[in-house]
Each structure stands twice: as C-alpha cells, then as structure tokens.
Amino acid sequence: MEQMRQDIIELKQNDKSQEQRISLLERTSDRHDQQIQAVTESLSKIHENTTWIKRTITGAIISTLSTVVVGGILTIVWNLVKN
C-alpha cells in the first residue's frame, strides 16, 4: 500500500514537471511565431524597396536611351540641313 502511495506521489510530481515543460515550450513557440512574423514583415518591406529601385533604374535607362536616340536623330538632321 505504501508503495502505491509513493508511486502516486511520483506520478503527480512527474505530471507537474511535464506541465511546466509544456508551458515553457508553448512560450518558446509563441516567441518564435512572433519572430517569424517580424522577419516576414521585414522581407515584405525589402521586396517593396527592391521593386521601387528596379523601377527607378529601368526609368533611368529608358530616359538615357531616349536622349541618345533623339540626340542622334537631331545630329543627323542637323548635318543634312547644314550640307
């Protein structure tokens, strides 16, 4: 009978220990979820900035090419008119 009581006490202690471990794991999991969410938001902002930079560079390239083409055409026309 005494052995059964000791076993029950031991089981209750193990149960408390398991509950504490589970609680710790749940808190850790919650922190990880928050960190993942923060990283996801940061990646989204980086993606938005990258898109803006790509558009700016593309616009600059198109402007440069347009200037070169128009300048070349004007030079050709000027030389034709001059001669």
From Swiss-Prot:
Transmembrane segments: 57-77
Gene Ontology biological process terms, A to Z: killing of cells of another organism
Keywords assigned: Coiled coil, Cytolysis, Host cell inner membrane, Host cell lysis by virus, Host cell membrane, Host membrane, Membrane, Transmembrane, Transmembrane helix, Viral release from host cell
Topology within the bilayer: Single-pass membrane protein
InterPro entries (UniProt xref): Haemolysin_XhlA
First-listed, main subcellular location of the protein, grouped into a coarse class: host cell
Matches recorded under Pfam families: XhlA
GO cellular component: host cell plasma membrane; membrane
Paired cysteines (S-S): none
Coiled-coil portions: 1-45
Localization annotation: Host cell inner membrane
Superkingdom assignment: Viruses
The protein's role, per its UniProt record: Probably functions as a holin together with holin-like protein 26. Accumulates harmlessly in the cytoplasmic membrane until it reaches a critical concentration that triggers the formation of micron-scale pores (holes) causing host cell membrane disruption and endolysin escape into the periplasmic space. Determines the precise timing of host cell lysis.
Record protein name field: Holin-like protein 24.1
Organism encoding this protein: Bacillus phage SPP1
